[in-house]
Structure formats: structure tokens, C-alpha cells
């Protein structure tokens, strides 16, 4: 797991609690989206269970910042950032059996007709709540969903989310950032 760093108690517990409360309130705006995988001609998932809710905190492609962006600043401020590519929350509802999404990289570039992973991006998966879902890497490593935990890894590592069966929802925040190579990030807690 040399390219994968797990950090527990990633942000101040008060900031985590505030973020969790805001994201799970009735007024928080979620949209329906496909997780990963094949779509039909209409752009809909071929698998009806391949659905989750999203909230875009930031997206450079659309020059979009959510009014809730300030709540992810404690996560962002833990890094030495050159640029934010995107910050997106995912909310999966409980499933009877664990559902594994397709392995993927978060951001790709087109090289001719081939997609290649964006090499200068660092991914952070931040876990909003604890549950028995997890993030699995194609190399076999699994990172359990523990509230206020972050897993940090290069965008070139293929990974997938696995749904939970023990709680009503699994909420994560997926950050894709360009970090300063000159000053490696300091991680709280060691």
C-alpha cells in the first residue's frame, strides 16, 4: 500500500460533525446519477442498482462551486493545493448484498483514441459516515468506510466503491486535486 495513505481523524471532529450534519439534512441538494460502468444509448445505466446520489461541491470544467463549498474547506485546507479539479459527494443507499462498482480512475485524458489517467491528480476519498462498505483497489487493498477517515492515492490507481449493507446510507466525498510536488502534504495524525 505504498502509494495509498490512510489517515484517521483527518479533520477536526467539530468540522467533521458539522459537515456530516449539513450533508444529511433534508435541505441538502442531491442529484441522481450512475456510479460507474456501461450505459445504454440514452445515457442510462444498464444496471438499475448502479445508482447513487451526487452533490458537486466544485467542478473546474463547469466553473461551478456549490453554496455548501465552505463545509469541505477543512478537508481542502489539509493539503497544499495548486488547483482543484473537482470535489463531489456520493451517497449510496443500503443494498441487501454488497454491490461493487466498476474499477475506474476518476479523471482521464484522451490520447488519440485511448483514455489515459490524468497523471498529475491526487485523489482523496473522505468518509462521512462509518459503515461496512469500502473502497477497493484493483491491486487488492481495501479501505473500510470509517467516519472522518481519508484515503489518499494517485489518480492512476484504479479503484471502486462497494456498497454497504448495515446502514441506511454510505456517504463519501471524492476530491481530485493537483497538489504541490515541491512541498509534499503534511498529514494530520502522522
What are these regions (language model features)?
Residues 1-82:
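Non-heme Fe(II)/2-oxoglutarate
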Residues 1-2, 188-190:
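Fe(II)/2-oxoglutarate
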Residues 81-101:
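A short glycine-rich, His/Asp/Glu-containing loop-to-beta-strand
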Residues 98-103, 109-112, 119-122, 127-146, ...:
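A short beta-strand-loop-beta hairpin characteristic of the jelly-roll/cupin
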Residues 103, 158-166:
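Short beta-strand His + acidic residue motifs that chelate non-heme Fe in jelly-roll/DSBH
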Residues 123-126, 167-183:
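A short hydrophobic beta-strand segment most commonly corresponding to one strand
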Residues 143-159:
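Conserved metal-binding segment of the jelly-roll/cupin
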Amino acid at each position: 500500500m505504498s502509494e495509498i495513505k490512510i489517515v484517521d481523524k483527518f479533520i477536526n471532529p467539530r468540522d467533521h460533525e458539522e459537515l456530516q450534519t449539513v450533508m444529511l439534512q433534508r435541505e441538502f441538494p442531491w442529484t441522481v446519477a450512475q456510479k460507474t460502468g456501461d450505459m445504454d444509448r440514452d445515457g442510462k445505466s444498464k444496471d438499475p442498482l448502479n445508482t447513487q446520489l451526487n452533490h458537486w461541491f466544485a467542478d473546474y470544467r463547469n466553473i461551478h462551486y456549490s453554496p455548501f463549498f465552505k463545509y469541505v474547506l477543512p478537508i481542502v485546507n489539509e493539503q497544499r493545493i495548486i488547483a482543484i479539479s473537482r470535489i463531489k459527494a456520493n451517497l449510496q443507499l443500503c443494498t441487501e448484498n454488497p454491490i461493487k462498482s466498476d474499477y475506474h480512475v476518476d479523471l482521464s485524458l484522451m490520447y488519440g483514441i485511448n483514455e489515459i489517467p490524468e497523471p498529475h491528480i491526487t485523489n482523496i476519498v473522505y468518509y462521512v459516515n462509518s459503515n461496512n462498505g469500502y473502497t477497493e483497489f484493483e491491486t487488492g487493498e481495501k479501505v473500510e468506510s470509517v467516519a472522518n477517515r481519508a484515503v489518499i492515492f494517485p489518480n492512476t490507481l484504479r479503484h471502486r466503491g462497494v456498497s454497504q449493507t448495515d446502514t441506511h446510507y454510505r456517504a463519501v466525498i471524492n476530491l481530485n486535486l493537483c497538489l504541490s510536488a515541491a512541498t509534499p502534504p503534511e498529514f494530520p495524525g502522522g
